[in-house]
Amino acid sequence: MVSISSVFTETRTPAAQFMRELEAWGVPISLLIAPHIDGNWHLAKDADTRRFFECKIAAGDAFVLNGFDQAVQGRRAEFATLPAHEARLRLTGAVAQMERLGFSTPIFAPPRWRLSEGTLAVLPELGFTRALSTKGIHILNTNTLVQARNLSVGEGYGASRWWRSTITRSVERTARRGGVIRLSVSARNLVKTKEAKDVAAAVAVALELGAKPSTYVEV
């Protein structure tokens, strides 16, 4: 499963280019979308990005709610430590804003995959059936966990050459043993050609070793 976060005005073009490359390989994308990013960008005010998301979702890519205000690196991850009542307020606001824009999803991924116990506890009452964390994929209606560590480029994680090489090796090991591969990249990093190529190369390695592409909707 490949996911992309931080798609907004300045990153939409490189994200679209990366997605076209993967689409040619039959790889769908899970789009991690929040109504706000860094407190400065607002999906409601960006009609072009909304249309981009609508077209991609209609074509088979997935929408995953990525918080209320996805913070830039340096700030604490939004849902990492929230107690249940605060998580409920933020999630309720995020769901309402996204639904007003015509987007709905039963899947939640907190920024940087850091999910507090309080957040996990309130997700079912808000209609979510899946939650994604650093540990894996939480199936909420059965209270089970599909263990699968997320491999991330950017968004608070590494993006250097050695880190990208480490991720490719991890993808290869997981694919060889038939495990679940979760690969994510920030669209901020797709602006950089070398980083985009290395992430695409990691996807190619997984495909060559028999990994079956899917989105989080299909788990």
Segments the model singles out, each with a brief description of its role:
Residues 5-7, 34-38, 68-70, 113, ...:
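Active-site beta-loop-alpha junctions enriched in small/polar residues
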Residues 40, 72-83:
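Surface-exposed, active-site-proximal loop segments in enzymatic domains
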